[in-house]
């Protein structure tokens, strides 16, 4: 079933795909799973929806007419929009998926796909969010980890270097959290995938390597 916040409302999913059959399929399937679903056929329609709605996750097709999925993802992240993004790609080349993660997508799924697999990925990404808490309530995770010039605030889900915030995607946050919670421990890809994503490592999945590389560049720069 769909994950809900403490207010009891359903999570809002925005599906962006120029194929109306895929949009309708996902609208029906995700609505049955308890989500509130919005649909957009391109970047302009996405912009109109985001002006009036705050969504919890975007399912974004890579190949769109006009502004493509990579450009949309890059634009949203440049505007400091941290809404989780799962990218759909019919392209078989690894490079397209890797670039998607490098510009800030949280996960990807190749077409054709099983809607149940997309649902599992949606729920996994949404689980990485902070739990909404009552105003004034102490954070359930108020730990701040310091290393070198960095402050990693688990409650605020933020990383600062010498006072300057470095934006993290939900996937990067989950990965950094797993690493700082297990310092000086050898970490296999299998263990890291389980800790950061709650799912088994897939042998041909390069996304772990990409997110580790992004974190390393962020920390070493």
Positions of predicted regions on the chain:
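Non-catalytic signal-transmission and effector/linker regions of two-component phosphorelay proteins
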Residues: 1-14
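Charged docking surfaces used in two-component/phosphorelay signaling
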Residues: 24-32
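Hydrophobic alpha-helical motif in two-component signaling modules
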Residues: 50, 59, 70-73
């Amino acid at each position: 079933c769909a994950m809900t916040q403490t207010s009891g409302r359903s999570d809002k999913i925005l599906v962006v795909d120029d194929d109306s059959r895929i949009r309708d399929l996902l609208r029906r399937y995700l609505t049955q799973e308890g989500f509130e679903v919005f649909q957009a056929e391109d970047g302009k329609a996405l912009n109109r929806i985001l002006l009036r709605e705050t969504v919890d996750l975007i399912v974004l097709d890579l190949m769109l007419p006009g502004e493509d999925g990579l450009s949309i993802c890059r634009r949203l992240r440049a505007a400091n929009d941290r809404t989780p993004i799962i990218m759909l790609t019919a392209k078989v080349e690894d490079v397209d998926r890797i670039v998607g993660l490098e510009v800030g997508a949280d996960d990807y799924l190749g077409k054709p796909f099983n809607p149940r697999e997309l649902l599992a990925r949606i729920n996994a990404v949404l689980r990485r969010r902070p739990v909404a808490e009552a105003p004034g309530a102490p954070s359930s995770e108020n730990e701040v980890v310091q290393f070198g010039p960095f402050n990693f605030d688990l409650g605020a889900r933020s990383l600062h270097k010498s006072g300057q915030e470095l934006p993290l995607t939900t996937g990067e946050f989950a990965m950094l959290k797993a690493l700082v919670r297990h310092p000086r421990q050898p970490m296999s890809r299998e263990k890291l995938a389980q800790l950061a994503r709650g799912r088994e490592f897939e042998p041909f999945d390069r996304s772990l390597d990409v997110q580790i590389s992004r974190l390393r560049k962020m920390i070493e720069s």
